[in-house]
Amino acid sequence: SAMGIIMAATWILTLPDRIRAINSKNMNTVKSVILDISGGGIRFSLSTPLEEGTYFMAQFSLALEECTQQFNIVCKVIKCTQSLDYADRYFARSKFIFDRITEREKIVRFVFEEERRIRRREME
């Protein structure tokens, strides 16, 4: 089931040096929806195909312990496939390239809390 987290913007990085690319001005913004998230990466849908190995900046927010936190994390595309149902829809899997381990811990905590909430709802 879709988590419904909207990735506000995804900047596609074209340079091999990802740090310089993140700061460069020639970045396209791609609207996409995160379908699944884990401590290791995200699966999302978008309207433009991404090449495997592409680095991009994922910008999204998660509700963590009563407050919403913004994340800006560099990701690397692992796989991108076209939807069987819609010609203009693609599904991509990417792994996080973390600068700080605390970001990963916060995402893992979000996933854990979300699973606990779902289990609680199923038991009601």
Q: What residue ranges belong to the model's regions?
A:
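Structured alpha-helical
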Residues: 1-124
